[in-house]
């Protein structure tokens, strides 16, 4: 005779293990839901479901729910079924699930249906008993279920806080868009964006659409990108999908593989070059073949163009500062040179040398994590310069360069602009300010040696720096909303 109650608990244990995989691999890993701007409602549902599963795992691990408690259990099952169906609807409305996540969710739903049906059979018998939570230990199985309950409860808290942060961020961005809208040029244009699904690209596309521009995004996964943008932009996997009859007025080139990560082996260097120089060359070749050329190319670059500035050197680096013979500088030089070749086709080119971009996504959350845990401190000597920019100022600066170039009506030319705030500071000062904004201590330094051992030459991005100034932006009349690190971090870190 099969013990249906024991079988139900075993299926619950499988649910806990598979749910942990789904949370860690998909929600926190590949999909990064806590950092996805459109995932607030999904995370709120996850938080509610996690609290239900926490109660079920712990409550059924060692107790039988007799009498009125059996009816409570049946009601909880009903609520969970409704929330599961709602979760499916919200997920499909906000993002394109990868195949592995969709399969995992299907298996979880089938398994949940099985153990809920089996436990409902037990509950009908429990309902006839006097009302009580009856101790009924299940040995190691019960201990595992209780552990699953603790884990899913913590996951629910994580999702609840993340959902709250996303809702607040959305409200803040809405208020900012209403009170200080970003204007790109004097009239609606047709814009092609590469790298439009990245941290900066997503924000740029939203601002372009809000300003009335028709946006096309060139991306590797057009279907997923179109889903993520809610169908308001055209997404293509190949430039050949843009008909010759469809004019493009402005191109914004932000594409490029992530710099920080694996060591810079020869293979990795080739990937970084191909994703920047190679892609930009493809873009310029496409421009050359167009019957009507775009009039402006805004192309990404980085302050790594200037190489490494000795820590004892406090001189400011403007756009005319020379590059160096190190890989990061050479990468930026080749990237910019590929973009500048568009001038030969009558296109204005602006190379945007980005500093460390501060935003709710990107590298800042990882940088702030040890500080928020009370374990922040200087990195290496802490004397290296950190040139940064708030992401909202970066978007505004793009709009400014666009507008000023449109006004100039001069022959096609190429210029470089430093996209950094005027308030560059040393890394230890930045960390101290971040700890102050987060109300945390700043006491635990990270020595340079293990960082260099782990990353090799790439460690220069963290342990060395440049004191870069936005000379051309300031000379052309641009004004930063967040000129100093404290105002930028306060805007990004404090709840609204």
Where are these regions (language model features)?
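N-terminal Rossmann NAD(P)H-binding glycine-rich loop of SDR-like oxidoreductase domains
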Residues: 189-211
């Amino acid at each position: 005779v099969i013990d249906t109650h024991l079988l139900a608990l075993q299926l619950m244990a499988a649910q806990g293990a598979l749910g942990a995989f789904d949370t860690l691999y998909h929600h926190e890993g590949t999909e990064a839901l806590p950092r996805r701007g459109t995932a607030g409602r999904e995370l709120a549902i996850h938080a509610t479901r996690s609290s239900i599963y926490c109660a079920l795992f712990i409550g059924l691990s060692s107790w039988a729910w007799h009498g009125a408690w059996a009816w409570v259990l049946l009601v909880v099952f009903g609520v969970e079924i409704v929330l599961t169906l709602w979760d499916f609807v919200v997920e499909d409305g906000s993002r394109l699930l990868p195949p592995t996540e969709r399969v995992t969710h299907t298996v979880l739903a089938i398994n949940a249906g099985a153990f809920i049906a089996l436990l409902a059979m037990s509950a009908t018998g429990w309902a006839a008993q006097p009302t009580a939570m009856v101790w009924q230990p299940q040995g190691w199985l019960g201990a595992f279920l209780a552990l699953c309950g603790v884990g899913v409860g913590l996951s629910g808290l994580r999702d609840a806080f993340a959902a709250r942060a996303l809702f607040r961020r959305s409200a803040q961005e809405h208020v900012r868009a209403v009170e200080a809208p970003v204007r790109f040029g004097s009239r609606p244009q047709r814009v092609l964006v590469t790298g439009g699904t990245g941290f900066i690209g997503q924000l740029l596309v939203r601002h372009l659409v809000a300003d009335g521009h028709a946006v096309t995004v060139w991306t590797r996964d057009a279907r997923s990108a179109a889903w993520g943008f809610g169908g308001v932009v055209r997404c293509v996997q190949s430039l050949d999908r843009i008909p010759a009859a469809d004019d493009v007025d402005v191109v914004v080139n932000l594409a490029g593989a992530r710099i920080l990560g694996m060591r810079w082996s020869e293979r990795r260097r080739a990937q970084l070059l191909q994703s920047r120089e190679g892609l930009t060359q493809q873009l310029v070749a496409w421009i050359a073949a167009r019957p009507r050329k775009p009039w402006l190319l805004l192309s990404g670059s980085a302050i790594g163009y200037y190489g490494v500035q000795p820590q004892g050197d406090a001189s400011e680096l403007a756009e005319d500062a020379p590059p160096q013979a190190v890989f990061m500088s050479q990468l930026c030089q080749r990237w910019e040179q590929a973009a500048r070749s568009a001038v030969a086709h009558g296109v204005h080119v602006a190379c945007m040398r980005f500093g460390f971009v501060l935003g709710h996504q990107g590298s800042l959350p990882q940088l702030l994590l040890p500080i928020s845990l009370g374990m922040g401190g200087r990195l290496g000597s802490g004397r290296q310069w950190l040139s940064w920019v708030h992401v909202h100022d970066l978007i505004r600066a793009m709009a400014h360069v666009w507008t000023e170039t449109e006004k100039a009506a001069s022959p096609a030319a190429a210029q470089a602009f430093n996209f950094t705030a005027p308030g560059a500071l040393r890394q230890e000062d930045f960390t101290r300010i971040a700890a102050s904004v987060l109300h945390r201590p700043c006491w635990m330094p990270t020595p340079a040696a293990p960082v260099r051992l782990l990353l090799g030459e790439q460690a220069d991005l963290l342990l060395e720096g440049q004191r870069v100034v936005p000379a051309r932006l300031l000379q052309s009349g641009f004004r930063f909303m967040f000129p100093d690190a404290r105002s930028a971090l306060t805007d990004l870190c404090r709840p609204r």
